[in-house]
Regions:
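ATP-binding N-terminal substructure of ATP-dependent carboxylate-amine bond-forming enzymes
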Residues: 1-124
């Protein structure tokens, strides 16, 4: 199963979300699931974090996921087309990010009010 974990966000609880998402990522069996870590910066930009972030938190119970920008930006494209849902932009190319389940580990504004969930539902 392809699982996307969303964390961070434009909220005063940004850091709390990073700690919570680290715990979630630590407890999903990466041998059975493909886990994509998607950080949302305090400015609202979405980035796909490298696999090394997942490995870091799974090896160290005190490690916290990063929210640093990467070369892979994530966008949400509404609709039901080939390039809809969560998509990765890298080197000027856009491709769908295979996703079966999104785990929104977002606290505070835009997370607990259902806004992000609504956006994802529109994107199918």
């Amino acid at each position: 199963m392809n699982i996307a974990i969303l964390y961070g966000g434009k909220t005063g609880e940004h850091e709390v979300s990073m700690v919570s998402a680290s715990s979630v990522a630590r407890n999903i069996d990466a041998t059975k699931h493909n886990i994509n870590l998607i950080s949302i910066t305090k400015e609202g930009l979405w980035y796909l974090q490298p696999v090394s972030e997942l490995e870091k938190v799974q090896k160290d119970a005190k490690a916290i996921l990063s929210d640093k920008p990467t070369e892979n930006q994530i966008v949400v494209i509404p609709g039901a087309g080939v390039k809809s849902g969560l998509c990765k932009i890298s080197n000027g190319k856009t491709e769908a990010l295979p996703t079966d389940v999104v785990f929104p580990v977002l606290h505070g504004t835009y997370g607990e009010d259902g806004l992000v969930q609504g956006l994802l539902e529109m994107a199918e």
